[in-house]
Amino acid sequence: DKDVPVSVWPEWELIEKIGEGSFGKVYKAKRTERGRSFYSAIKIISIPASKGELDSVRSEMNNEQSTREYFRNLVEDCIQEIYTMEHFCGNSHVVSFEDFKVVEYLDEIGWDISIRMEYLTSFMDYCTGKELTEKEVIKLGCDLAMALIYCRKLNIIHRDVKPENIFVSRFGDFKLGDFGIAREQAHTMSNMSKKGTYSYMAPEIYKGEKYDSSIDTVSYTHLRAH
């Protein structure tokens, strides 16, 4: 597939694109060892996202160095997601982080950030053509509650709890993922930004007011109501 790039890990072959959003594209990847196949999900975030974005920033900056620094700061922001995911290693209620690589372009301003994670089924795909059983609904609520409890222990606010950011393991466990806009609470209390999805967003966010980890509880409540 011409739309599937080459993996930065030679042993992992990108098979197909399985997701795309404002925080990058996600691919299913396969590694073959001793006749057995293993799978991972690899998210690739390109900064800048397009030549148009690069040209737009260039037109506003005084020089090439300022343009490079602007995008380098965005790279550091994205690496924040990786640091956030590392906090959750070993937690069964959050998507497991496995590895990452940052590759800087040689001929132009730009970076590709590859994040390798466990391969799971998206909640939206899991629900396609079926209704959740009462047992599954209860388990979904309990698993997400445990994920948010752990977030609170680490002073991390997810800020975008919604169906698209929930995943399901082959054992039927529900996991919270995509910490692309998550931040450690201590770093965001004095300078909060409006990020999240309006359908599940706490009023404090879209009103531009200060908020704390309770906003994830509000999103969780909205999610259960749906």
Q: Which residues does each predicted region cover?
A:
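Catalytic-loop of the protein kinase fold
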Residues: 152-168
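Conserved small/polar residues in nucleotide/adenosyl-binding loops
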Residues: 221-226
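Conserved activation segment of eukaryotic-like protein kinases, specifically the C-terminal portion
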Residues: 192-204
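Activation segment signature within eukaryotic-like protein kinase domains
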Residues: 140-141
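Conserved short submotifs of the Hanks-type protein kinase catalytic core
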Residues: 108-123
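Short beta-strand micro-motifs within the conserved protein kinase catalytic domain, predominantly
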Residues: 96-110
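Conserved N-lobe ATP-binding subsite of Hanks-type protein kinase domains
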Residues: 25
